Amino acid sequence: MIRAILTDIEGTTSSLSFVKETLFPYARARMADFVRGHARDATVQALLADAKAAAGDPSMDDEHVIARLVRWIDEDRKITPLKALQGLIWEEGYRNRDFFGHVYDDAVRRLKAWHEQGISLYVFSSGSVHAQRLLFGHTAAGDLQPLFSGYFDTRIGAKQEPAAYSAIARELNLPPSEILFLSDIEAELDAAREAGYKTFMLVREGGAKASHHPQGADFDAIRPELL
């Protein structure tokens, strides 16, 4: 019996194009001005220190770390301080209504139905928890945050490592076999299955893929009670 659903965001609840074509360019274009304008903010200072450590050069000056952050965006690196800084920049964008968080209609519909059925819903994304909350809190369908019981990011572990899913199961105090993980990435699903989870692959573009995971084109294809 599935008691909790853990979902990815990019390519799963939300379109890849929203992240790649809206969020990433928005943060990239504003990274330098944001860092310079908030250089005395304690939170930003701590994140810059973490970014310098991740770059292997704690003595790096701010201009060089800005250049490194922009390069990491271009390389789509999943580096925790970068993701946190992106989240702070996106917060300004959501607040200014420069964009809304994209969530597929079928995902909204099924998430609401599962919530009403008493299934606990959680998010696991490489984006920071702050960024996750912003996306689901500012959608065209309204604030979806009340649907979710918790959020996880790379601080719990890498998404392609079984240990991350084991850690999440411990946090939820549930047997892994009672958790369903949703993603569009085979390696993430493999890691979750190795940890004992049930899995389902979203294939929103390009048709069915060769996979040993159950799959479907949208959330309406997911039947937790049958997995």
UniProtKB/Swiss-Prot annotation:
InterPro entries per UniProt = Enolase-ppase_E1, HAD-like_sf, HAD-SF_hydro_IA, HAD_sf
Gene Ontology annotations of biological process type: L-methionine salvage from methylthioadenosine
Q: Which prosthetic group or cofactor does it need?
A: Mg(2+)
**Known catalysed reaction(s)?**
5-methylsulfanyl-2,3-dioxopentyl phosphate + H2O = 1,2-dihydroxy-5-(methylsulfanyl)pent-1-en-3-one + phosphate
Q: Which domain of life is it from?
A: Bacteria
Q: Name one GO molecular function term.
A: 2,3-diketo-5-methylthiopentyl-1-phosphate enolase activity
Q: Which UniProt keywords apply?
A: Amino-acid biosynthesis, Hydrolase, Magnesium, Metal-binding, Methionine biosynthesis
Which SUPFAM superfamilies does this entry report, sorted A to Z?
HAD-like
Gene3D superfamilies found in the cross-reference section: 1.10.720.60, HAD superfamily/HAD-like
User: What family does the entry list?
Assistant: Belongs to the HAD-like hydrolase superfamily. MasA/MtnC family.
Provide the protein name. Enolase-phosphatase E1
- Say which species the protein is native to: Methylococcus capsulatus (strain ATCC 33009 / NCIMB 11132 / Bath)
